[in-house]
Structure formats: structure tokens, C-alpha cells
Amino acid sequence: MLVLGIESSCDETGVALYDTERGLRAHCLHTQMAMHAEYGGVVPELASRDHIRRLVPLTEGCLAQAGASYGDIDAVAFTQGPGLGGALLAGSSYANALALALDKPVIPVHHLEGHLLSPLLAEEKPDFPFVALLVSGGHTQIMAVRGIGDYALLGESVDDAAGEAFDKTAKLLGLLYPGGAKLSELAESGRFEAFVFPRPMIHSDDLQMSFSGLKTAVLTAVEKVRAENGADDIPEQTRNDICRAFQDAVVDVLAAKVKKALLQTGFRTVVVAGGVGANRKLRETFGNMTVQIPTPKGKPKHPSEKVSVFFPPTAYCTDNGAMIAFAGAMHLGKGREVGAFNVRPRWPLSEIVR
């Protein structure tokens, strides 16, 4: 069965073809990054219009790449939410119209479920169950995943998502949009503990997270540096040091919370998905992750246990059609009919009912 996947939740237009027998056949992506850069962020109206312009050419490009035709498509999957309303409508309308024209079923997909399952597109796939860390510009959540459609929310950010905190901090440092990736790049040249920022909620017993206070700590440090230098410009090395300290703080919090989730669930496999999953420091830290089961005081300590950690291929960390095509394929025959204008800009993953 050949499933066409369509992603249009924000500022990437993604189209892909997934074959249930042969795997991913084609993957085409257009990013609107350059278009939004001059505005310092995503402009929803511009995003929607660009999706409309790109969907047909990208679909035809995928078909050519796979050596297939419209008649070979067996189902059309699309992102129903969450995301920008207008952007979602562009993809939904196109998917429903195409499915109607081809007389094929349409499968609505939750955007975060697409991210959650994206590591299954890799050659080395995780086995269920696992703890999933969904970490992006819009969401930071820890989930217990026991199978396709069986997801339980364990904890999440109570304010800014980690990716959002990266972008906002980058802006404080004068980095151009999208600044999160640039911040990570500059952090590579930062000195260890030249600055030390707080790790919000790292010691709380629950799995909730918070990153807005960390952003405020960076602002305080930046203002202090500017006052000391008597200028608005931040010295290059100092900026790099701040980037390093900020990134280390975020990664430390994420790692600590995921370890707690592993102890809570008893799982020993972690899946990291979402745009921040491409961060090199995050991959390095999680790649060396171990957990140690707590022991009563005075008793011998349990040996540390190695954790199996899986990331999607880097190309599938950001929004893409491949993850939507794959998630749709996993739900073939379970889809529900939806109208072309029935999108869900706000849609908690916990509300998925299969």
C-alpha cells in the first residue's frame, strides 16, 4: 500500500510517499525559513499562501522520485493538527480534494504522533515500549509509548517549549531568525562554566519542566555584560560562553527528567524526536545515558544500567512529510472521515482515540 503524506502545520511544506512493503519511497521538503527571516518569525498568512503554491509541485516531484503515478496512491495522510490554522487548512484542503479525486481514503494524522514515530523510519528501530522525549519549538513533552496509538503523557513544559526558549534566547543575543540552530553552533566555541545558569525544576519529584526562568537568567547576564562594557555589543567569546551555558542547562534538565521517567516506568529505551533532537549536545548527552535504581541508605548500590537511545535521521527531526506518511500507513484502515476544513490547531496528543 502506497501512502502519500502531507505536512503543512507551520513553515515547512513536506510531501512523501511511504510503501508498507518497501518503506519510504520519496521525500520532498520546502522550507520557508528565508521568506520569514526578514520578519523575525513565522508570518501565518505568508506561510499558508506558500503551502498552497508548493503542494502540487512537491507531490509531482515525489511521484517522479518514486517512479509512481497518482493512480498508484492507495491513501492520503495529512497533518490535522496541532499547528497554525491557515497552514493546516492548506494541507487539509489539498489532501481531501486529492483523495476525493482519486477515490482513496484520507487519514488525518496528529503532528506530534508523526514526530513520535519518526525514529521508526531509521534502519535501526526501537522496540516498544519506550520513553519518548518530544522536543521542538512548540512542544516539550515526555511520553510513555507502549505501541502505535498507546501514548501516555508523563510530563511537559509548563511554559516555554525548549525549542522556543532556544529561539528567544538567540534573539536576546542578537542572533537572526531562526536563531536556535545558530545558538547551538556558537555554543560549540563556548567555555565550560564561564557562565552558570539555573536548571529550573530539575530536582522536582514530578516530570514537569520550565524554561522561561532560564531565559530570564540569560537576559540578566546579557544586561550585566552590556553595563560592564558600556556598549550594546556583546564580545564574541562572551556570547559563545552564554550560548554554551544556556544549552548545557537545557540539556541537563531534559536528561534529568527523562532519567526519572525511565525509573518511573521501568523502561530502558528512549526515543528523542522533534527539531531540537538534531542538537549535537543533546545527542551526545543522551547517547551516553545510564540510569541507576535508587537503593535504601546503607545498602549496596545497584550497578548503572545502559539505556538504548534512538533518534530519527537528522532529515526527519524537523517537520516533514515522511513522518506523516509513515504514521498514516500505521493507521491504514483505522482512519476516520473528516471534512476538508476540520483541522485542530490546538490538539493534545493525549486526546488521540484510535
Curated annotation (Swiss-Prot):
Free-text function comment from the UniProt entry: Required for the formation of a threonylcarbamoyl group on adenosine at position 37 (t(6)A37) in tRNAs that read codons beginning with adenine. Is involved in the transfer of the threonylcarbamoyl moiety of threonylcarbamoyl-AMP (TC-AMP) to the N6 group of A37, together with TsaE and TsaB. TsaD likely plays a direct catalytic role in this reaction.
Catalytic activity: L-threonylcarbamoyladenylate + adenosine(37) in tRNA = N(6)-L-threonylcarbamoyladenosine(37) in tRNA + AMP + H(+)
UniProt xrefs under PANTHER family: TRNA N6-ADENOSINE THREONYLCARBAMOYLTRANSFERASE (PTHR11735), TRNA N6-ADENOSINE THREONYLCARBAMOYLTRANSFERASE, MITOCHONDRIAL (PTHR11735:SF6)
Keywords assigned by UniProt, alphabetized: Acyltransferase, Cytoplasm, Iron, Metal-binding, Transferase, tRNA processing
Species the sequence originates in: Neisseria meningitidis serogroup B (strain ATCC BAA-335 / MC58)
One Gene Ontology biological process: tRNA threonylcarbamoyladenosine modification
Entry binding sites for Fe cation: 111, 115, 319
Gene Ontology CC annotations of this record: cytoplasm
CDD domains in the record: ASKHA_NBD_TsaD_bac
Localization per record: Cytoplasm
Name recorded for this polypeptide: tRNA N6-adenosine threonylcarbamoyltransferase
